[in-house]
């Protein structure tokens, strides 16, 4: 019986890539800088002391970071016994965004340039805005700028509730984000607006990766909170991923936990499980692992590392999240059968000590564990697609166009 369990710690980079200069990210190091802050006592808010990740260390995380950067992260044990196979991988794709990283993990790198809304003010073309107002019968709109999602809610949330005007905003990523209040605007109405925006972006040839619904609750600035009803409307991958091949060629199953299905535009997904927060995502993953049959992938995205702590530049929160993940990791490992493989990885970096609020161009860890997986270094991987090619070989699907099998 062949089963693979893929856990993406969203934004968990382990050191700047060779091409980081192109992105303004030379020196970025999500893991390294979190560990450094913890070791210096600068991340003691809600947690305390050096970064404590014994289980990830046993799977090779510290060694993978050493391969990427040349040093073991501060406070981590570089001499611990390693029971898994580990690598550090470079991104072939042109961007440092979520779809590019995930698609490349599944064997399909993004070799074209996404479209971006690069102006920080008046970010969106007037023609696009006019069509959205007309088609969705809107009283207008707010925002039309670059912003962090939590900041813009404090700035415009109250006005949105009074006027019914949706909040449009973007970032350095290829995204069009729409924030609306779940109760005063309505969740279904927000989703419908996002569908219209997706259509107009496609019809207008803007080549934008995702439209993201950002629902929130609360009654005034300072207590607005985004909810777990976020929805990403992505374009479809440009070629069949290893997920699609497993379903089509092997009649396999691919279970999405969290936002995986959204990222792949539901392509190659046979079951979707919603969950919000690290513990709930863990619980849902464990349930699906227990029920998984032959030729099954259970694929989970742990988005909080990125959305709650990376973008918000919350070092202590990120560290506490990693430590929670590490404490629960043995629960996953104990469920593995003889032929199973567990892959822990990331899709890009988001260094919480870095300037700004955007992603960082970094190597990702590739930690592979299973009863039959030989421990040790798998070295520097030239593309995340090596993960997809490894899965293609493991499940016996046709080869992926990109990537080399790691074992």
UniProtKB/Swiss-Prot annotation:
Cofactor(s) the protein requires to work: Mn(2+)
Cofactor binding note from Swiss-Prot or TrEMBL: Binds 2 manganese ions.
Coiled coil: none
SUPFAM superfamilies: Alkaline phosphatase-like, DeoB insert domain-like
Similarity-based family: Belongs to the phosphopentomutase family.
Enzyme class: isomerase
Binding annotation for Mn(2+) 1: 10, 347-348
Protein name: Phosphopentomutase
Any one Gene Ontology molecular-function term assigned to this protein's record: manganese ion binding
Function: Isomerase that catalyzes the conversion of deoxy-ribose 1-phosphate (dRib-1-P) and ribose 1-phosphate (Rib-1-P) to deoxy-ribose 5-phosphate (dRib-5-P) and ribose 5-phosphate (Rib-5-P), respectively.
Main location group: cytoplasm
Biological or metabolic pathway of the protein: Carbohydrate degradation; 2-deoxy-D-ribose 1-phosphate degradation; D-glyceraldehyde 3-phosphate and acetaldehyde from 2-deoxy-alpha-D-ribose 1-phosphate: step 1/2
InterPro entries per the UniProt record, alphabetical: Alkaline_phosphatase_core_sf, DeoB, Metalloenzyme, Phosphopentomutase_DeoB_cap_sf
Subcellular location: Cytoplasm
Binding site for Mn(2+) 2: 306, 311, 359
Gene that encodes the chain: deoB
Gene3D superfamilies in the record: Alkaline Phosphatase, subunit A (3.40.720.10), Phosphopentomutase (3.30.70.1250)
Pfam hit, one: Metalloenzyme
Organism, scientific name: Shigella dysenteriae serotype 1 (strain Sd197)
Catalytic activity: 2-deoxy-alpha-D-ribose 1-phosphate = 2-deoxy-D-ribose 5-phosphate; alpha-D-ribose 1-phosphate = D-ribose 5-phosphate
Lineage: Bacteria, Pseudomonadati, Pseudomonadota, Gammaproteobacteria, Enterobacterales
EC number(s) per entry: 5.4.2.7
GO BP annotations listed: 2-deoxyribose 1-phosphate catabolic process; 5-phosphoribose 1-diphosphate biosynthetic process; metabolic compound salvage; nucleotide metabolic process
UniProt keyword annotations, A-Z: Cytoplasm, Isomerase, Manganese, Metal-binding
GO annotations of cellular component type: cytosol
Disulfide bonds: none
